[in-house]
């Protein structure tokens, strides 16, 4: 899952006349987040000999958003001098890191830091310009093993409650395909853990799954409440873009109650919005604080880690940003809070090895 990046789309315009027709169609596909189909169109008129640097960058971004970092790097390099914006510049650096070209990534990051000196990623890099070497040479603390229920599709977002293991997967081939990567829509599954690597055959969590994306999830320690991500379309909350014949929705958070092993009364959380996404929930062991990722106003970067108080009467406080100790001008996501108040999260805004790296911080300090 290292290469399954969670990033907002970026669209380049002002294409050259030769690619005007194809690029116009590609723009429509990109606006619908259908990057795989956009690549098919763009590669018909863009190649390594092309003079259309803006089209090259558009193709590079499509490859980047679909985790094809080697292809993305090739086109970023060819059109490097034409990069005008910070996001695309950092995408290129991230590709180099993901492709293990750390010296090139550091050289590109130095140029980024000179151009965008106030960016938190620049200041952190200049303070820790040997961070990559330190990461590569650090002693391994964990042993990673594959378990027997992985598929050839995306499987992630694992959550273990007693012996029941919940996770998110796009393995149901009958589901409609998501245009971003042409994989089936995500569903929530559960499996019974038999030992460290052997789990029972996964079963879809039908009472929460819909025809849209579901997951990841988090469950309270007593097993009574579940928090899960889904799409705003499930509650008919979206904007219509009539001239494009599009419907624009968001990822939102929902909660449900366990009634004799069945999840019932699913309802949206009150801080959901049509204007921003809220996802990746993690509830603490006392069921008093919910952590999540969001691009809501008031943040520092793209996606930030936030928290909200869960009151005793079931209401919620006002979401609070966790601030610059955790969040950067990049993306922070997938928070997980453990019983000792250690927060684990993923970030691409710090010196790392490419894509989303895992970090932890003790929230007691």
Regions found by a protein language model. Give the residues of each.
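Bacterial Sec-dependent N-terminal signal peptides
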Residues: 1-26
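Start-of-helix register in tetratricopeptide repeats
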Residues: 20, 54, 87-88
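Alpha-helical segment of the N-proximal tetratricopeptide repeat
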Residues: 20-44, 48-49
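Short, conserved micro-motifs composed of acidic
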Residues: 91, 98, 102, 111-365
